[in-house]
Amino acid sequence: MILQDQIKIFCYSGLIPFILIPIISWISPKIAFDYYLILLFFTWSIMMATFMAGTLWGLSIKSNESILSSTIIFSSVFLLSLFITFSAENYSILCLFILLLIYEYIYFSERKLIEKTDWYKEIRFHLTFSIRICHLLMIGFIFTNQ
């Protein structure tokens, strides 16, 4: 298996929970609430954003660019994690929207670093687009079922 195929498999495998959780939540809200699927979605999204910040860090170093974008993402994800953990109120829609903005920032930061890799740029576009839709679906689900 060539490197491009391995990267595609890993990239799209990471997308599976982003897709399945909103689908299950919309089909059966009871399952979503009984099995804490909203929290699972948050957790998965935060883990993936952290992972993407790490890959952005590596790409920045390899390209001899500033690691400021990665640092901003790590800080944002960390602060959002603390906010989710310690907030007494239900700010899930706000937190999902912030995560959506973090993924946008990751995409635009990474896009500059992968200019010469067209096949990977295409994958990142499809993944980020899908992640946007999934976050919007979860925001809609939470808004509808409050």
Language-model-detected regions and their locations in the chain:
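Hydrophobic core segments of alpha-helical transmembrane domains in multi-pass membrane proteins
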Residues: 44, 94-105
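Final/C-terminal transmembrane alpha-helix of multipass membrane proteins
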Residues: 124-145
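Core segments of alpha-helical transmembrane spans in multipass integral membrane proteins
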Residues: 13-19, 40-86
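Short juxtamembrane and helix-loop transition motifs at transmembrane-helix boundaries
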Residues: 1-2, 29-38, 53-65, 90, ...
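N-terminal membrane topogenic signal
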Residues: 1-14
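Alpha-helical transmembrane segments of multi-pass membrane proteins
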Residues: 18-28, 109
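Hydrophobic alpha-helical transmembrane segments
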Residues: 24-25, 80-89, 141-142
